[in-house]
Amino acid sequence: VVGCKPKAEVPVQFAEADIEVNIYPDYKDIVVPPNIAPLNFIVRDSIATAYVVQFTGKGQELFAAAADDAVIRIDTAEWRSLLMENKGNDVSVDIYAKRPNGWIHYKPYKISIAEEPIDAFLSYRLIEPGYELYRQLGIYQRNLTTFEEKPIYENNREYDDNNNQCINCHNYRMGSTESML
């Protein structure tokens, strides 16, 4: 461990754990497009204090690590390279956790990389839980190849009794999303 963040390399000694890793979001055994943003995740292991993740595909390896916050953040450039080189193939994911008795290796899982890219943008309305009235509400656009999110339209940043209106969030112009991009 270097500073607060462990070094991203496979531990020299570890025990094989005959259990599946619990991650959030659950990205185990899924198919992803080759241009998707890095699939950062949290490892849920209440007694572990450090984590190392190894992605392996077609002669390439990508490593990521986390301390006791368990948040795995994947380098964007390395992620893009790994996915582009593995279109139509699987990438194996091995996760190691440092527990009080030493490192363990969870059962590996795979991520299949599709040949086809995903459309870059998704638009959606973002509303507060229990939404009943025209309050703070907006239509947003997210770039699925990055983490960039932009408002297309926001009703109100703050509640205003005299200035609330429908923003037509159920309909796109002439039923088409083409003009949203």
For every predicted segment, state its role.
Residues 4-181:
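Sequence signature of WD/YWTD-type beta-propeller architectures
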